[in-house]
Amino acid sequence: MHIAIVTFEGYNELDSLIALGVLNRVRKTDWRVSIASPSPRVRSMNGVVIESHVSLDQASTADAVIVGSGRQTREVVADKALMARLQLDPSGQLLGAQCSGTLVLASSGCSPESPPAPT
């Protein structure tokens, strides 16, 4: 099981880092949790810089995807080239989002039959 936590520039640390910490406590050999970002490093809304584990392309093939929130979510969804890199499949992936991350799910073409639900 690969779980990708999609994290953009201006991310909210509470969303991405708590999800990473809690999910990494599951100790199964086939369990992997990754921070997925459009660049090798992203800076949070409070200046915390983290390195990405996987790309957005790799997040698109993960078994589950969690999209975190951030200060720049509206800019993210307005960036058509950036959004095109995130190819999510609601019929084959477990999708979730936190707070404004639901805007990313809604803008990524998720089916209206399976609307995003924020945490």
Where are each of the predicted segments found?
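Extended, subdomain-level signal for the structured scaffold at the beginning of enzyme domains
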Residues: 1-95, 102-107, 112-113
